[in-house]
Amino acid sequence: MMILKLFLRSHLSLDGTNGMLEPWLESKGLGEADQVLAYFAVSKLGEPPIDGKTDTNPEGLTAAYGKWATAVAARLHAGGLSCKVLDKEAFQKQMLEKLIWISAFMLVGARHPGATVGVVEKEYRSEVCSLIVELASAAAAEKGLTFEEAMDERLCAYSRAVAHFPTAVKEFKWRNGWFYSLTEKALAEGKPDPCPLHTAWLKELQVV
């Protein structure tokens, strides 16, 4: 599975990463660019793509936003893949949920060497759910939005769909780094750390 973001302006360009791209997009004058959040994967060359469907979201998780969203969705549907067309706020919330997923599951997994995403979901669920709640609260406060209830259930369901994935804290700038930047900003302003558990575990692993 992956996050894939398509940026359409006067022409189609492509960029992809498992992480927070909003600051980078804004720095390039692309804050309003059309985007696609893709949840599908190809196991190997020639294999059909595997759609990102879970037991809590059987309709699929892939989503598109912007002027060309309907056209992108139609092309994905033609290829047998799901795709929802969302407004900007709904898309942003789904993007942030995926960021929370990868930041939380990778960090908890790294605390337990050898743990896959599936092992984290089964054996360390209380740890990862505590972190999900903390990161969701920080993200909601920063962006001024409200997430739908039961995020932990949705993210655990996604983890069951990609249970074989290994865990590691990497691409820090794009993933956990965004949440750590909220910590740094709060502390610089003399405010409490909005992500104390996240910060403690990053320090435990000597990431920061």
Feature locations, PLM:
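ATP/pyrophosphate-binding catalytic subdomain of soluble kinases
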Residues: 65-95, 101, 105
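Rossmann-like NAD(P)(H) cofactor-binding subdomain of soluble oxidoreductases
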Residues: 1-50
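NAD(P)-dependent Rossmann-like dehydrogenase/reductase catalytic/cofactor-binding core
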Residues: 70, 74-77, 81, 126-208
